[in-house]
């Protein structure tokens, strides 16, 4: 019964695959919970810096930091911070955000603008290289708990270029975490900082600060920290989205494997039944011939 043996081999192979996808689903679920905790833990820090910086900026309207406005002599070039994953098996997560990046690049190209990019994650780096984009720096293999130092080094290339007037905008591209079942690709303007980004929450007091050494130095440092916090938050959200998408993808793969095993077992049983029926028919026919 060669056909039956072949089907049994397929069933065994799919069962082994099912065990792997189930294990990957459980690992992704555990990592997702930790990634969500890191994502939520980063929000209060960014919110507090935003409120303090907003109050300082409103109290000193005569000073405009380079991050808050576009230089009149800025080059017609935009910078992109593209956040993707290092690994695959997470559904269409990377495809969706890279499609959004491509759309923005084409829009800017139609307006006569050039683009430079920093890639965070192997998938984005590979994509940008394939389409011939100018990648000025990158950060990969960040692990499950990224450190700010490893992120800011590459991104600072774009921040410095913007401050020097070599770029007229910087865009942050990542996947925003909505919930376990839904993630949203985002291409948002990082620089110049939009007015709503530097808006104090309702109920926040506008304190009369004393500055040491001076207001300009404090605002300069806080704005840099705020931009760093926005980038870290984007990476944290992208990682939470990655693990959620991977968990869902592996669950779907496990469910599909179970369905396929059921179908293969049905085929095997039918094949086996057909073989038994054939053998019985041959025995009966032989007995009838002898009789």
UniProtKB/Swiss-Prot annotation:
Q: Which domain of life is it from?
A: Bacteria
Per the record, the GO terms for biological process are: proton motive force-driven plasma membrane ATP synthesis
Q: Name one Pfam family in it.
A: ATP-synt
| Name of this protein | ATP synthase gamma chain
Role this protein plays: Produces ATP from ADP in the presence of a proton gradient across the membrane. The gamma chain is believed to be important in regulating ATPase activity and the flow of protons through the CF(0) complex.
Q: How does it sit in the membrane?
A: Peripheral membrane protein
Q: Where in the cell is it found?
A: Cell inner membrane
Molecular function as annotated in GO: ATP binding; proton-transporting ATP synthase activity, rotational mechanism
Q: Name one GO cellular component term.
A: plasma membrane
Upper taxonomic classification of the species?
A: Bacteria, Pseudomonadati, Pseudomonadota, Betaproteobacteria, Burkholderiales
Task: Say which species the protein is native to.
Answer: Methylibium petroleiphilum (strain ATCC BAA-1232 / LMG 22953 / PM1)
């Amino acid at each position: 019964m060669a056909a039956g043996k072949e089907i049994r081999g397929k069933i065994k192979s799919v069962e082994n695959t099912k065990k792997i996808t189930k294990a990957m689903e459980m690992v992704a679920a555990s990592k997702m919970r930790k990634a969500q905790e890191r994502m939520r833990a980063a929000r209060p820090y960014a919110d507090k810096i935003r409120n303090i910086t907003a109050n300082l900026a409103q109290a000193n309207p005569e000073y405009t930091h380079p991050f808050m406005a576009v230089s009149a002599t800025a080059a017609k070039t935009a910078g992109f911070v593209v956040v993707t994953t290092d690994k695959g098996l997470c559904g269409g997560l990377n495809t969706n955000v890279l499609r959004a990046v491509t759309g923005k690049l084409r829009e800017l190209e139609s307006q006569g603008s050039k683009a430079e990019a920093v890639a965070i994650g192997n998938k984005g780096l590979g994509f940008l290289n394939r389409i011939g984009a100018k990648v000025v720096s990158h950060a990969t293999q960040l692990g499950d708990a990224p450190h700010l130092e490893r992120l800011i080094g590459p991104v600072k290339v774009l921040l410095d270029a913007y401050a020097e007037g070599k770029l007229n905008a910087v865009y942050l591209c990542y996947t925003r975490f909505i919930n376990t079942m839904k993630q949203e690709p985002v291409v948002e303007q990082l620089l110049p900082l939009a007015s709503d980004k530097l808006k104090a929450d309702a109920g926040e007091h506008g304190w009369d600060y004393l500055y040491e050494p001076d207001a300009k130095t404090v605002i300069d440092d806080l704005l840099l920290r705020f931009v760093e916090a926005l980038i870290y938050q984007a990476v944290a959200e992208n990682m939470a989205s990655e693990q959620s998408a991977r968990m869902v993808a592996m669950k779907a793969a496990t469910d599909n494997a179970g369905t396929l095993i059921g179908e293969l077992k049905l085929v095997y049983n039918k094949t086996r039944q057909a073989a038994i029926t054939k053998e019985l028919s041959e025995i009966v026919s032989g007995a009838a011939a002898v009789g």
